[in-house]
């Protein structure tokens, strides 16, 4: 599949063809914030949608989530909070995700048709943000991958504190980092 499968399924569901597409939004992941759209990706997208579509690239994974949320808003002003397992690289001494500052919790302000990053949390190397912590809980209860966090979210309403009790799911380590028990 890749994006081609999603694109064609979406066009089929809407009953449109590629020539009806004016703008394509592309979002980076696991790349440095501020990176340029890779030319191979631009070429691949243009092959599917044609030359008429304008390509808009968002190198920040979290900014991409924020724009998707804003697209659903009817409000003039909003605080958009993105809580994710991990997004794009903010800063990396080694050039990869290992030991890098990575987007995990980002706050954006939407005002006057402008999206502005206000702050970030949990982005230092080794820190565990809310999304990553949730994925660790997902693994702790027996799911095989952090990709199963959505299944875990679906089970949340069925939880019963009297059955679960006070199981210590996490604690703070000597270095001040959260970790699973």
Where do the protein language model's features map onto the residues?
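Short acidic/glycine-rich loops and adjacent helix/strand connectors
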Residues: 1-181
